[in-house]
């Protein structure tokens, strides 16, 4: 289908209310797949669909059909974002984004993976696509009634879906977003700046002080059980040969969240640095993989329970979609990211599962020397080798097509190609060519019934995701899934490597190396993107080096405090942890030691922080109280006192943000780069080690802390007066903007939901309870199952009907059996197949 010049009307996300009890349609059947005669979709009071059919194709047809009813514009733009086809409908403002997406990712290899799928896998993707297309055909015939308002406002029609399209929304949302982060060029830029500032030896020491690989004191999901080996950090000899590499082209968004260009070229770099300095790295989707999870076996009133909070971010429509699938090989209920065909947080009454971002290192960048006589060749294994090259044609609304070259070296896709400088940069990805396998592994996980079978199944997962399981008897399982490379000796994974073949990857590590555990002796599994196991090294990601300063301690302490408690008491942890200060536990001992001989004002300030409940709850006027106000000011001063003189003004943007919710936050809130580095440095001193670089310039830590506290007190007194009890800090609202993780519109610009203050919790929260006989479920998915407005501008059904529930830490039940589904249903729709 093509563009619509003057489309009007609005798609009613819950059309079944209008069509009565049995509205029949007659979609076209695809060849080679048996079809049942009908599919039935029930919806409850929140609009959550439950699909009943006889085959895998049928339930996935119903899945796609329901998604199209609820989220058609969001899914259209997700598909275009994943494939780099945004400019085709939104114009040249998105051309730079499309160029990036079309040249940095290997789209042909995804298509080949889909073409090579077994028929059982293809039935699932094709069923989903056919269901989407059936609803789109209806929309095309009844635009005034059914077309979602954003299509009319942006002036184009929804496009047809294929099995390939369904695969790409997974690849774009999981592999491209959660398994492709890389900071190696950022790290190299910082290292070189520090070597220029301090000399080669001290600069290298400072780099290792900020970006280490292993911290013995960092909390782990699998408990420590012995000594930890350390990789010696030796400055790679090839760094002396490495020329200046082109900076990474990261997405830049405006204050509303809309795509505003790339960080390479124009004013994009300055805008990116300003945002990071103000809001911190966790405000940017390329640095903020997040989510939390805790599971406890043998609670007092159940066999076990889990609570998952995937922190995808907050957007309208929601990043999360709830559904039940019943038929063929599937009998499962739950929810998933962006209506992906794999249910990420679900149960089948035998087994429940969930996930968090693993944040392990699956990518490396290699710098390549170009042939000065032919820049389409690079030096590898002693000879000039030609890139694999293919054209990518980008359609641009209202303008001529643009053709760009996609290149691939032996290591991976080429992200930068600079003939004038004689170099290129290629990125190796452990999951490249296997992302569709990752999708199907997750899909078929829903058919497993034991921890052991699930663990075997998860060997097929290729992206770095923490996977959790719980059976109906409350037994717990954990696998740090993904494929991880064998790196050559001398390859520092924090920095770009030589691409001449000397340090290419040497295959993949065996699945036995992946951290995993069943039935841990602790009786619980807890994760907030912390280190999976003691021997597992940190990735190169600048914003997330594993340290003792880790927010997961909040969950660990609270789970330990309610050991043997009820399900309700374990669930209540979610509310407390959503507001708890992430730095307090590390800073209070320093403050109390620093004010032993301090003035009464300083002692009063420390007492204020010591008596504080550590909660960042906003008051009725939209402000935080005296203690959080002081804490934010103190952290700001402390980070400045410790790091500014060492790194300089031009690099301090990397350390400046306190990460507190007085600034708009992204998917989550955690300890800052500066705080992790400072705590790690102090831990080494406490352990009797002499750090290679002195962050405090010979001063006692007490003196630096006291000076920072005095600076905070002086600043607040000048701004708000000397009476501490009246100090206030304005809260940034918690917003659900209408843009996806690339800044692409997924709703109209006025579709913004908000709450007065930030909650450090999942984009959804789900609770699964093991009863011994089955699994009970409840969840909450704000704003709602829908997310678009009517032509009049009024919200449609299920636009935001879970937002209040979410704000109050409430949950809605998720029925499983057909009897319970029918009992809770407020509508039923039957789709006839032929």
Q: Model regions: which residues?
A:
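Second-shell loop/turn segments in exported
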Residues: 60-62, 109-123, 426-428, 439-445, ...
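C-terminal motif of bacterial Sec signal peptides marking the signal peptidase cleavage site
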Residues: 18-21
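Glycine- and hydrophobic-rich flexible loops that cap the catalytic core of alpha/beta enzyme folds
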Residues: 327-337, 342, 346-351, 355-501
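Bacterial N-terminal signal peptides that target proteins for export
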Residues: 2-11
């Amino acid at each position: 289908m093509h563009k619509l010049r003057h489309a009007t009307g609005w798609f009613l996300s819950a059309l079944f209310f209008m069509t009565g009890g049995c509205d029949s349609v007659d979609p076209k059947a695809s060849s080679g797949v048996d079809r049942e005669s009908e599919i039935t979709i029930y919806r409850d009071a929140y609009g959550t669909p439950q699909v009943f059919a006889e085959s895998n194709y049928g339930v996935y047809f119903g899945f796609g059909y329901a998604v199209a009813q609820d989220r058609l514009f969001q899914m259209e733009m997700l598909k275009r974002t994943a494939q780099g086809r945004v400019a085709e409908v939104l114009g040249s403002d998105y051309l730079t984004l499309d160029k990036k997406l079309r040249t940095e990712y290997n789209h042909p290899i995804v298509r080949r993976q889909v073409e090579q799928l077994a028929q059982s896998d293809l039935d699932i993707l094709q069923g989903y696509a056919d269901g989407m297309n059936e609803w789109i055909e209806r929309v095309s015939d009844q635009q005034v009634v059914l077309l979602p308002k954003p299509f009319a406002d942006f002036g184009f029609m929804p496009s047809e879906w294929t099995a390939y399209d369904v695969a790409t929304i997974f690849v774009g949302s999981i592999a491209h977003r959660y398994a492709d982060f890389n900071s190696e060029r950022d790290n190299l830029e910082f290292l070189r700046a520090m070597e220029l500032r301090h000399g080669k030896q001290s600069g290298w020491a400072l780099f290792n002080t900020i970006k280490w690989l292993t911290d013995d004191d960092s909390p782990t999901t699998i408990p420590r059980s012995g000594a930890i080996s350390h990789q010696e950090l030796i400055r790679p000899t090839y760094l002396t040969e490495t020329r200046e590499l082109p900076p990474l082209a990261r997405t830049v968004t405006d204050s509303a969240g809309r795509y505003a260009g790339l960080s390479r070229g124009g004013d994009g770099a300055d805008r990116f640095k300003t945002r990071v300095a103000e809001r911190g790295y966790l405000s940017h989707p390329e640095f903020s993989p997040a989510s939390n999870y805790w599971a406890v076996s043998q609670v007092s009133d159940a066999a076990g329970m889990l609570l998952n909070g995937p922190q995808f971010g907050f957007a309208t429509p929601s990043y999360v979609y709830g559904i039940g699938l019943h038929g063929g090989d599937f009998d499962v209920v739950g929810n998933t990211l962006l209506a992906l065909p794999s249910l990420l947080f679900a149960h089948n009454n035998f087994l429940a599962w969930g996930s968090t971002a693993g944040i392990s290192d699956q990518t490396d960048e290699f710098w390549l020397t170009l042939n000065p006589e032919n820049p389409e060749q690079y030096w590898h294994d002693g000879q000039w080798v030609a890139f694999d090259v293919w054209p990518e044609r980008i359609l641009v609304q209202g303008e001529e097509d643009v053709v760009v070259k996609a290149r691939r070296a032996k290591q991976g896709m080429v992200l930068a190609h600079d003939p004038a400088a004689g170099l290129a940069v290629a990125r190796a990805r452990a999951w490249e060519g296997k992302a569709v396998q990752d999708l199907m592994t997750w899909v078929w996980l829903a058919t497993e019934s034991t921890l052991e079978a699930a663990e075997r199944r998860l060997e097929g997962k290729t992206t770095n995701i923490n996977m959790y399981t719980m059976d109906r008897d409350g037994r717990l399982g954990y696998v740090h899934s993904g494929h991880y490379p064998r790196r050559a000796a001398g390859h520092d994974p924090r920095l770009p490597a030589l691409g001449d073949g000397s340090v290419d990857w040497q295959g993949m590590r065996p699945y036995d190396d992946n951290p995993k555990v069943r039935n841990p002796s602790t009786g619980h599994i807890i994760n907030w993107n912390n280190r999976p196991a003691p021997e597992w090294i940190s990735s190169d990601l600048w914003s997330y080096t594993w340290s003792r300063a880790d927010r997961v301690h909040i969950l660990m302490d609270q789970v330990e405090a309610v050991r043997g408690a009820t399900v309700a008491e374990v669930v209540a942890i979610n509310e407390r942890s959503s507001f708890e200060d992430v730095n307090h536990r590390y800073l209070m001992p320093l403050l109390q030691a620093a004010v032993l001989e301090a003035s009464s004002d300083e002692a009063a300030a420390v007492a204020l922080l010591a008596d504080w409940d550590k909660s960042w709850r906003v008051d009725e006027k939209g402000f935080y109280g005296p203690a959080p106000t002081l804490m934010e000011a103190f952290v700001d001063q402390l980070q400045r006192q410790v790091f500014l003189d060492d790194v300089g003004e031009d690099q301090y943007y990397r350390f400046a943000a306190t990460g507190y919710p007085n600034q708009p936050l992204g998917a989550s809130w955690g300890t800052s780069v500066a705080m992790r580095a400072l705590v790690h440095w102090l831990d080494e001193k406490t352990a009797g080690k002499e750090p290679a670089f002195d962050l405090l310039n010979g001063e006692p830590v007490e003196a630096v802390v006291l000076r920072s506290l005095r600076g905070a007190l002086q600043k607040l007194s000048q701004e708000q007066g000397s009476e501490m009890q009246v100090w206030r800090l304005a809260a940034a609202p918690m917003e659900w903007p209408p843009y996806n993780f690339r800044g692409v519109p997924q709703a109209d610009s006025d579709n913004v939901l908000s709450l007065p203050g930030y909650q450090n919790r999942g984009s959804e929260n789900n609770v699964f309870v093991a009863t011994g006989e089955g699994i009970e479920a409840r969840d909450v998915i704000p704003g709602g199952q829908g997310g678009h407005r009517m032509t009049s501008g009024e919200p449609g059904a299920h636009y935001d009907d879970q937002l209040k529930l979410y704000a109050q830490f409430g949950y809605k039940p998720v029925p499983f059996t057909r009897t319970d589904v029918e009992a809770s249903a407020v509508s039923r729709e039957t789709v006839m197949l032929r």
